Amino acid sequence: MHINRISNFKEYQSHIQKNNRQIKVLRGIDFKLNQKIKTHKQFYIDGYSWTAQSNSKFLVDTLYSNGNELNLRERLICNKTKLNNRIRGCIHVFETLFKPQLRDKIYMTEQVSLLAKWMNNKYDNVVGSECFEDDTLMHKIKLLVKYFPSKIKHQDLTKLNFNSDIFNYVLSFDCFEHIPQYKKALKEVFRVLKPNGKLLFSVPFDLNSQSNLVRATISEGEIKHLTTPEYHGDPLSKKGCLSFYTLGGSC
């Protein structure tokens, strides 16, 4: 994997121009996959899986697509680990760039996902949590039964109940866009990180926008939608989790 450090929107545009030929090759691959799916309900392609540390097959299908273009970010499911393209990419970056040790203390903003299970199987000191949007007693009982004997830990990323300076790494994948006060959440993350600790996060990102799109706001518990509501997958809720932002160059 080639990892490029880009600090602002101008550097991103320069990167696109310099790597135009390679980007055309990648878009050509995308085009071929989108053409093939028109005549196949689903199919597999061969490749190397970082999380499996071996060759694997990857599922291509139309789930989460917009009807015109495949959602390769959320699909390309590894046949061995069952992790999607985005998650495998994040772990590839995490382990290649940061080189974590097995005993490092890691906090993840997820607990019941396939990734959380994979991380706990590999690393010795992983702490995970979920955020209960529905904190009614009935919902908590349903979750208790569903995930028994595991105990789901609730954390609000804007007010974590951890001591300061305790984690080597914090991993948060597609979480911050669901937090109205995401900058407050970032401050909390840096509070619980050790000196020289590192945060790795992913968010849905509009590569063509220099500013954030505010999709919804919340005041005194009342949500005001500014665009068509967008919900992302949530393992704790069938409804999904409301996205308050599509982040851009000003995030």
Model-predicted regions and their roles:
Residues 19-105:
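N-terminal juxtadomain amphipathic helix
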Residues 101-222, 249-251:
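Conserved SAM-binding loop
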Residues 84, 180, 246:
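Conserved phosphate-coordination/catalytic loops
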Residues 4-27, 31-47, 183-251:
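S-adenosyl-L-methionine-dependent methyltransferase catalytic module, highlighting the catalytic core
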